[in-house]
Regions:
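Bacterial N-terminal signal peptides
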Residues: 13-23
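Bacterial Sec-dependent signal peptides at the C-terminal "C-region" and cleavage site
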Residues: 23-32
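N-terminal secretory signal peptides that target proteins for export/translocation
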Residues: 1-7
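Cleavable N-terminal signal peptides
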Residues: 16-17, 27-28, 93
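Disulfide-stabilized, aromatic/cysteine-rich ligand-recognition loop
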Residues: 168-192
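Short, flexible loop/turn elements at secondary-structure junctions
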Residues: 79, 115, 157, 189-191
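An exposed tryptophan-centered "aromatic clamp" motif
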Residues: 86-107, 113-167
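Extracellular adhesion/carbohydrate-recognition regions
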Residues: 31-108, 184-188
Length: 192
């Protein structure tokens, strides 16, 4: 055993020296170079990316209506909440739209959920809802009137419930027909 250690001792010493030189170069050069640590890394200032361009092509018609050119749908500039200052359940929303005259038109209807998607704009983040809550900005163009509802009733309904479009997240939901909280309707018509 002693003979084995005598043979291996020079090899182990060389291995230890190689380890120190390879993995700890500052230790072997410390006396010669008076090792001084580098300055800490300072990252460049953050520059946010430019905003994405909107995919929508909205035109303010100047008569209380807005037209989305691609879909050729005409929308009321004010939704029911901005117009009346209160929320509406599904039944009241249907009646509101049926009796609406805006921009010289009286053929307004309740939109389907997919049609709300034609004015939902994820490049927008406007604090224009009825309570102006900065925690819940609407993905809606500032061409639309201030004081808007957070979500809108659609014409898609059953015996108890109807589909709605939520303009904070862009997700559709199902709500009971008599629900009212922070909701309304934005009337639409075909403009072809």
């Amino acid at each position: 055993m002693i003979q084995f250690l005598k043979i291996r001792a020079p090899f182990l010493s060389a291995l230890l020296l190689a380890f120190v030189v390879i993995f700890c170069p500052g230790v072997t050069n410390a006396e010669r170079n008076h090792y001084v640590p580098r300055d800490p890394y300072v990252a460049p200032p953050y520059v946010p990316p430019p905003p994405l361009p909107s995919r929508l092509n909205l035109i303010d018609n100047g008569d209380g209506t807005i037209t989305e050119k691609k879909s050729k749908l005409m929308w009321t500039k004010k939704d029911s909440f901005a117009d009346l200052g209160r929320c509406l359940n599904w039944y009241d929303s249907k009646s509101y739209v049926e009796n609406l005259t805006t921009g010289g038109h009286n053929d307004w209807r309740m939109p389907e959920v997919w049609e709300y998607g034609e004015i939902y704009d994820n490049t927008e983040s406007n604090v224009m809802a009825m309570d102006h809550d900065p925690e819940n900005p609407l993905a809606l163009s500032s061409l639309f009137a201030d004081g808007a509802a957070y979500w809108y009733w659609s014409s898609e309904h059953g015996k108890c419930c109807a589909r709605t479009a939520y303009f904070v997240t862009g997700l559709p939901f199902v709500r009971t027909l008599d629900k009212c909280s922070k909701g309304g309707v934005r009337a639409v018509r075909n403009n072809s």
